[in-house]
Amino acid sequence: MVPDKMNAQKLAYEYIRERMLDGTYKGGMKLVEERLAGEIGVSRTPIREAIKRLEQEGLIKNKHVYNPTAQDLIYIYEIRIALESFAAKRAANYMRTETIIELENTIKKSRNLLLEGQSKKIYNETQHFHDLIINECQNPLMIERLEEAQTIFYLFSLRFDIYNRPHLIDEHEEIYKAIKNKDEQLASDLMAKHLYKDMNFTLEIIARNGQY
């Protein structure tokens, strides 16, 4: 069955995006419309529209899978520090009890994964921790910008092992406690410091790999 126009667009977009995020389509890879159309089973028009949408999201540049640089990483962190520190402040005021419990659970799961030596799986819990806080800012435009920044950062993380930063889980716990105690300024300050440390740690990894 040939998908209709809207379904074909959605199928093409989700197919390409998923393969970018799972590392199948690596940074710098050229996306060829004709080949993708045959792979997905749609015409070239929805492929073209999917690529255009992914370009708008910053995931594709000049029909190549975006390959973030160290400078791009700094720009992304500047966005995250500004917006997520504000989101943490809002979370300290508005986060519901059930969400606070879920926030604590991400920390418990992260500690268990660390004990089990599954450091790469900690990324998912880290992402969930930040997503819970971001969603509490109650600002759809801010959420959209942060989701885009985090997606680009995820593309970057596929190239390096950035999961073993010292004290990352402890910092999450400090942020969680500030939010639980409704200390908005402390929550905001701790989030900013946490992301600065994240940025510096990641830049050190890039430098060690000779890609800075």
Where are these regions (language model features)?
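Short linear motifs at protein or domain termini
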Residues: 1-93, 207-212
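C-terminal effector-binding regulatory domain of bacterial HTH transcription factors
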Residues: 2-5, 188-212
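A short secondary-structure junction motif
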Residues: 19, 23, 149, 153-156, ...
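Residue-level signal for the nucleotide or nucleotide-sugar donor/cofactor binding architecture
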Residues: 42, 181-182
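Conserved amphipathic alpha-helical segments that form helical-bundle/coiled-coil interaction surfaces
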Residues: 80, 97-158, 168-178, 186-196
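Active-site loop of classical SDR/Rossmann-like NAD(P)-dependent oxidoreductases
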Residues: 164-166
